[in-house]
């Protein structure tokens, strides 16, 4: 693994330290000469602060550094400048309340929405601006407006999950804060501190123990960014649908697109209507445009229709649905396989990707008064930030999601293990993620 100077995730939580028997008193003789501030650990210094917020410049710097690490390195002749701008800031309460009262703001996490513009792509990053859990929560290089109900709900769920993982870290720090502060007093180093984190504090932490593990070194992400609209659905019937973007047809279906992208990665031999699927042609361009050749449209259209038929997809004008285990059925038709459905598990994803196997993920909403929200997509990469400092080990896990929306909203999302429960805009999720790991040829 490569050692990096890592602005991206400035801090995680140091182990709980032994406290003095009497928090009000020092554990050393008051006449003892004060030791250097360097004898305090980073987290002991943080425990003495009365304000944990990072400066906006530090927030922007973290996004810039993450972009350098997470994005492919273009040639110098084509490299564009990354323009960053803070669009909004939301204080999220440690209890998980989306918006805090004035009293609650005294101990809340500021979440920054940072707009990213580079070349012809316009995306965003979500960033925690609190030193207790300063990290990138989501990094999305390209995002269109959230114009469909499905996109809005699924992206909201992923954002909420990333924020939830962040809140847990801050909450844990609060449980050991007094112990850390008392240890600092025991070292007889009590001094006034700025209300804001100084840049030197961040730079010191950057020089300590960060290592990055990145799946791209051994497993490239998908080369295609397909979607559900035209021309992917061009072989479905026109039956009075009103969406012009879909050529007045039913959408191809998220489950169908996820399966199609998995097949494209492994290129199994497949004949549809007596004609072999030309994977090389299909993958020549990242996306297939509406202006593509008739031959290319036929290839992608018949592939999507074939998968839909094998998966027994139910086509409706507003959404096309497949069963949660449809991928198991379709893969079996082309000499491929995957694991049975399991709840989201980081180790399964990590091992699957390292073994050269994609992972299908899905989020399933429960019945509610609005409508059921389900989505399937492909996890095709990961990023791990490993932190080893003063006998304390911590990791932050990111998965790279290819969401099947023509590349829009694909990116790295900070996620934790299964068991997250929350409600967003009337849609309840009892279990955020399920996965089919180890997609591969038999």
Spans of features found by a protein language model:
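Structural recognition of the beta-strand scaffold that forms the well-ordered cores
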Residues: 113, 126, 253-264, 299, ...
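Cys-His-centered catalytic/binding microenvironment captured across papain-like cysteine peptidases
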Residues: 25-58, 66, 70, 74-87, ...
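Bacterial N-terminal signal peptides that target proteins for export
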Residues: 1-9
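C-terminal motif of bacterial Sec signal peptides marking the signal peptidase cleavage site
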Residues: 16-19
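Soluble non-cytosolic domains of exported or imported proteins
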Residues: 53-57, 245-257, 318-325, 343
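Active-site-adjacent structural segments surrounding the nucleophilic cysteine of cysteine proteases
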Residues: 22-25, 139-147, 151-317
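Exposed beta-strand-loop-beta-strand "reactive/processing" segments of non-cytosolic proteins
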Residues: 77-131
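Active-site-adjacent substructure of cysteine-protease-like catalytic cores
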Residues: 98-121, 337-398
């Amino acid at each position: 693994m490569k050692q990096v100077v890592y602005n991206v995730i400035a801090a995680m939580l140091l182990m709980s330290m032994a406290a003095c028997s009497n928090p009000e008193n020092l554990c050393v003789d008051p006449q003892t000469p004060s030791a250097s501030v360097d004898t305090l650990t980073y987290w002991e210094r943080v425990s003495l602060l009365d304000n944990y917020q990072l400066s906006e410049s530090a927030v922007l710097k973290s996004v810039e550094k993450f972009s350098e690490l997470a994005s492919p390195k273009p040639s110098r002749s084509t490299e564009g400048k990354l323009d960053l701008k803070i669009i909004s800031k939301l204080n999220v309460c440690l209890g998980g309340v989306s918006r805090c009262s004035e009293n609650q703001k005294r101990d809340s996490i500021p979440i920054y929405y940072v707009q990213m513009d580079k070349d012809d792509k316009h995306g965003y990053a979500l960033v925690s601006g609190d030193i207790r859990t300063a990290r990138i929560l989501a990094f999305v290089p390209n995002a269109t407006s959230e114009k469909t109900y499905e996109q809005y709900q699924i992206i909201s769920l992923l954002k909420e999950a990333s924020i939830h993982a962040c809140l847990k870290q801050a909450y844990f720090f609060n449980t050991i804060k007094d112990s850390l502060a008392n240890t600092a007093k025991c070292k007889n180093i009590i001094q006034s501190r700025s209300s804001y984190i100084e840049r030197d504090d961040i730079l010191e932490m950057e020089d300590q123990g960060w290592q990055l593990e990145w799946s791209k070194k051994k497993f490239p992400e998908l080369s295609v960014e397909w979607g559900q609209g035209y021309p992917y659905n061009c072989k479905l019937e026109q039956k009075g649908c009103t969406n012009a973007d879909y050529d007045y047809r039913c959408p191809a279906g998220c489950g169908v697109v996820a399966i199609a992208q998995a097949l494209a990665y492994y290129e199994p031999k497949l004949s549809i209507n007596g004609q072999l699927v030309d994977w090389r042609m299909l993958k020549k361009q990242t996306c297939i445009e509406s202006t593509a050749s008739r031959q290319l449209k036929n290839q992608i259209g018949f592939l999507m229709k074939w998968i839909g038929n094998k998966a027994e997809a139910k086509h409706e004008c507003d959404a096309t649905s497949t069963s949660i285990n449809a991928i198991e059925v379709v893969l079996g038709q082309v000499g491929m396989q995957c694991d049975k459905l399991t709840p989201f598990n980081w180790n399964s994803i990590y091992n699957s990707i390292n073994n050269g196997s994609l992972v299908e993920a899905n989020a399933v909403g429960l019945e509610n008064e609005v409508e059921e929200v389900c989505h399937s997509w492909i996890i095709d990469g990961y990023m791990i930030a490993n932190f080893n400092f003063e006998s304390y080990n911590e990791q932050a896990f990111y998965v790279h999601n290819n969401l099947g929306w023509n590349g829009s909203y694909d990116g790295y999302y900070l996620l934790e293990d299964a068991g997250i429960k929350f409600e967003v805009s009337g849609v309840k999720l009892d279990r955020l993620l399920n996965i089919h790991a180890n997609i591969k040829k038999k």
